[in-house]
Amino acid sequence: MAIERTLSIIKPDAVAKNVIGQIYSRFEGAGLKIIAARMAQLSRAEAEGFYAVHSARPFFKDLVDFMISGPVMIQVLEGENAIAKHRDLMGATDPKKAEKGTIRADFADSIDANAVHGSDAEETAKVEIAYYFPALNVYSR
């Protein structure tokens, strides 16, 4: 299996619930290493830039408004099969459809306030990581 990196964001709803540590424990318990992390209050421009691929979608404005509604925790995870592993930990986008024991089933309230974001593919992960972390701030360990 390949060692991969993926971008993970703990969204404003989960940060407000004070569950960052519980989510980090799940990452580490699954063998994912946190190799870069920072808390941020995203600006509208940052959120719009990050989610630009969705700019034509009807939910875009609500998504951006939500992502700037409070601080987020942004991290890079590294490990074997990190992208798929992280997506399995997150669960389905809609927490009502997420498997019991996943981050979204346990901590998310709705399809909009769904606790976490994760890269969906290796190419996306590279772009998303570069968006928030210049290479000099990411450390394999």
Curated annotation (Swiss-Prot):
Catalytic activity: a 2'-deoxyribonucleoside 5'-diphosphate + ATP = a 2'-deoxyribonucleoside 5'-triphosphate + ADP; a ribonucleoside 5'-diphosphate + ATP = a ribonucleoside 5'-triphosphate + ADP
First-level EC class: transferase
Signal peptide: none
GO terms (BP aspect): CTP biosynthetic process; GTP biosynthetic process; UTP biosynthetic process
One GO MF term attached to the UniProt entry: metal ion binding
Cofactor requirement: Mg(2+)
Family annotation (InterPro entries): NDK-like_dom (IPR034907), NDK-like_dom_sf (IPR036850), Nucleoside_diP_kinase (IPR001564), Nucleoside_diP_kinase_AS (IPR023005)
Active site (catalytic residues): 117 (pros-phosphohistidine intermediate)
EC annotation from Swiss-Prot or TrEMBL: 2.7.4.6
Pfam families named among the record's database cross-references: NDK (PF00334)
Places the protein is found: Cytoplasm
Record GO cellular component, one term: cytoplasm
SMART domains (UniProt xref): NDK
UniProt binding sites for ATP: 11, 59, 87, 93, 104, 114
Family: Belongs to the NDK family.
Role summary: Major role in the synthesis of nucleoside triphosphates other than ATP. The ATP gamma phosphate is transferred to the NDP beta phosphate via a ping-pong mechanism, using a phosphorylated active-site intermediate.
PANTHER family in the record: NUCLEOSIDE DIPHOSPHATE KINASE, NUCLEOSIDE DIPHOSPHATE KINASE DDB_G0292928-RELATED
HAMAP family the UniProt entry points to: NDP_kinase (MF_00451)
Subunit structure: Homotetramer.
Name listed for the protein in its UniProt record: Nucleoside diphosphate kinase
Native species: Herminiimonas arsenicoxydans
Lineage of the organism: Bacteria, Pseudomonadati, Pseudomonadota, Betaproteobacteria, Burkholderiales
